[in-house]
Amino acid sequence: ETGVDIDRVAGSQRQGRVSENDIKLFVASKTYEIPKPEIKNNEKLKQEYAHSDFGEVEIKDIPRVKKLSSKYLMNSWTNIPHVTNHDEADITELEEFRTSFTDIYTGEKKKITPLAFIVKALTASLKKFPNFNSSIDEIDEGKMTVKKYYHVGIAVDTPHGLMVPKLRNADNKNINIISSELKKLSDQCRNLKIDKKELFGGSMTITSLGGIGGSFFTPIINFPEVAILGVGKSEKKQIFLDGKFV
């Protein structure tokens, strides 16, 4: 339980046997260090048989973005404790409001995704709960960095791999601007026109299944952030509320 090498403890019992009290005294003396286990990340697993032993295979190069993102994801998954909570939200009124947007010049309907509203809601939540807008990158010193800016990361699935650009100062932008910037960031990522610095310095990340479907999932926190918001697809359903189905 204490990690003590019992051979280093002087026993006080007959024939040098070590008692529980001897171990406690040894620990209290602080004259030793508990050996830390060596953890090797990405240790190569050896296959007993080659894949080609069972049929035809094709060897492909992994795109650079995917190789880089896999290292970041592995680091996040192994170093950040993950606790996941699933919940549902009624977005009936949000959808009515979102689909009512029209262009003031042409009168045509404006296409604004639900993600723009979620970004705005997240920034309000971060202001109310600032610990979620932080990074714990100095854990040994017992310090955390609480950010005073609101740069929301948006997970973008591209042919090159997963990228997470930051929508800067989201708290100071309206829904129209957020919506247009979301499209701009997505296009820049898919065309590999995004500046490297724009992939860093985030407050919290949003990742959405809206494009591919799926209700619940467990996304990996984007280090050095401390939380991530996973959003499933929206759907119509009947619920029992106030004694009746609605």
Task: Annotate the PLM regions.
Residues 11-12:
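Catalytic-site-adjacent helices and loops of nucleotide signaling machinery
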Residues 2-4, 8, 17, 21-25, ...:
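C-terminal catalytic/motor cores of large multi-domain enzyme assemblies
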